[in-house]
Amino acid sequence: MARSNLNVSGIEIANDRPFVLFGGMNVLESRELAFEVAEKYVDVCTRLGIPYVFKASFDKANRSSVNSFRGPGLEKGLQILADIKSKFGVPIISDVHEPGQAAPAAEVCDIIQLPAFLSRQTDLVVAMAKTGAVINIKKAQFLAPQEMKHIITKCEEAGNDQIILCERGTSFGYNNLVVDMLGFGIMKQMNVPVFFDVTHALQMPGGRADSAGGRRAQVTDLALAGMSQGLAGLFLEAHPDPDKARCDGPCALRLSQLEPFLERVKAVDDLVKSFKPIDTA
């Protein structure tokens, strides 16, 4: 059975514990920018007392256009992530797109992420599970919350019970996503930590013809609504200049706004978890 409480490099991850931040940037645009972003997150999270895991992708294999920027690739990308881990002393999370990437990614990353579009790909799920790493499973835009139990079972059958589920929005017609707040409770009943990816929930897939649009202006509203559900953590991407970001800039928080944004998220999380649970069933 999957675990309701996980420990990643001394960080406790559970729905009833203070929230953990999976934060960073969408894709590794450059070594220098990655270090700048990591330093800002570490400084802010240290001041606010928020447990922190750095996130960035070494390869974005699911871009809308064949001409879209994908990142430095597996080898160079993992080296950058390893260097960030060493310099800042933080755990790392990054996503895996092919079974052959799972083992090398798990050697560097404390958490490996299963992309939403690929979450039903059994060979990929099994390869990731067999690494023994903690797995963050993004809920596919086309799956109901209750269907995530089948992906958990695949991981368990492959010998891995260290599983996190992450909500990132559900398809609502064309070029739009919505977040069903009731879905958080359904996934929490599966005895796993549940996170909210507020960044990608703001996407408008294909909304800019050859790339995704987004609704950055609503990031605070949606984040506070999601964290009111009593979650294990928040997934967030930020950028010094989102309008120049090479992937998902329309959804990214401005890096300069990170501290006031997280102050609000932490206040909601602290308040919600100060209440005693009540059974209304």
From Swiss-Prot:
Its main location: cytoplasm. It is an enzyme of class 2 (transferase). It is found in: Cytoplasm. Pathway: Carbohydrate biosynthesis; 3-deoxy-D-manno-octulosonate biosynthesis; 3-deoxy-D-manno-octulosonate from D-ribulose 5-phosphate: step 2/3; Bacterial outer membrane biogenesis; lipopolysaccharide biosynthesis. Its EC number is 2.5.1.55. The keyword Cytoplasm applies. GO terms for biological process: keto-3-deoxy-D-manno-octulosonic acid biosynthetic process. It comes from the Bacteria. One of its GO terms (cellular component) is cytoplasm. Gene3D superfamilies: Aldolase class I. Keywords: Cytoplasm, Lipopolysaccharide biosynthesis, Transferase. It catalyses: D-arabinose 5-phosphate + phosphoenolpyruvate + H2O = 3-deoxy-alpha-D-manno-2-octulosonate-8-phosphate + phosphate. GO terms for molecular function: 3-deoxy-8-phosphooctulonate synthase activity. NCBIfam families: KDO8P_synth, PRK05198.1. Belongs to the KdsA family. This is 2-dehydro-3-deoxyphosphooctonate aldolase. The lineage of its organism: Bacteria, Pseudomonadati, Pseudomonadota, Gammaproteobacteria, Pseudomonadales. The gene is kdsA.
